[in-house]
Amino acid sequence: MAVMMQAFYWDSPKAEGKEGEWWNFLAEHVEELKNAGINAIWLPPVNKAASTTSMGYDPYDYFDLGDFDQKGGVKTLFGNRAELVALIQKAKAHSIGCYADMVINHNSGADEEEINPLDGETRWTKFTPKSGKFARDWNSFHPSRFEREMVEGENFAGFPHLCHRNPTVYSAMFDYARMLIEELDFAGFRFDFVKGYGSWMITLLSNYRFEKDGATDFMPYVVGELWSGGDDIDTWLEKANRYTDNQIAAFDFPLRYKLKGVCDQPNFDLRQLTDGGSIVMKRPANAATFVDNHDMGADTIVNDKLMAYSFILVHEGYPSIFWFDYYNNGLARPGTPNGINALIEAHHKYAGGDSQILHADPNLYIMQRIGWADKNTQQPGLIYVLNNMGDRWSGTSVKTQWPNQRFVPVAWDGHDAAYPDERMTDAEGNAEFPAPPRGYCIYVPLAPEANKDEVIAGLK
């Protein structure tokens, strides 16, 4: 019952003419994001990288947040510490948490070369950052006296690979995490390239009790980026969560590639959405679902992308909206039932309880969320229809959990602009639920006397 937004795309400050001003630019959008139903924003790496024109995935000084003149300037590509703090505090005032992008696998931009005495190789491993914190030498990286051969993980793009078993490195990672949460007021972490190092490092950071908001036992939201198949991610989640009571999530790459198939392959078999290959189907509580991100490049989804967003916003998992899709691709569509805003509204109001697949064939997928209620939440559930047919509306009769129930469409989109009709189940809960060609429709239960125009998403 929460939605995050990835609040950047690759080189977004350059593309938007906001170099060194991205934190300020995001702050201008906080109120709008709050009104749209965004609960958290994932920020790019906040510390100084090997260059002030870098996106930050080549970290140099973890404790320079844009305040020291090094690597080509003072500010990072996104701004400075004061502007970052102002953004986080404004977001917090609007009940939006901020997630920090943690790049702790590798470093870049070393100041000197060194000869590693363990293998005689010369590498750029001498770091003397102007923050005065976390100076590094060859022993901070692999091969190190603390780990000559990497027990877990792999190198990334030839960058010096941090040895987390070195006590100095290990301590610096905790100092960095404490700064982000206890000083800057971040609420969670996204860990980059987790296949590069042992999951135990993330487990320990996730299970640490941070001081935040007057409490001494705050545990952040934690999600890892493991760009791999379902079995690999499942194994990683099993290991990462073995010794922590703060459950760690993973981005659902297998689902994302299935959704690309839905959108970009006209003959994609929708039954593939029902198998156990995706994280959300096997471990919904550990799934961070998404459609595209900053790394996809030429592999981005190009057709009917709202079909993918509709899927992640009605199913379990923690859905992430991509800034470029929301703003640059114009998929927010505020004030209509045909965009991301309407899907977010439906997610918050109706998408509670377990998902139950009612029908799946190559071209039609129908699911019900059974609803959820407690002292703080009332989500009555929904019926979701996804239609892969490109030339006509399609639906079928399914047996729902609701007998003699009126259903109204609240969010929909597709290759036909027609307004979906209301539905009424019979005494056994049966009714036919259609969706537009190459589109989707979300139906929700509504009392007979209620005005449907008051519940259609996006029309408030």
Task: Tell what function each PLM region has.
Residues 2-5, 25-32, 38, 45-47, ...:
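Active-site-proximal helices and loops of the catalytic beta/alpha 8
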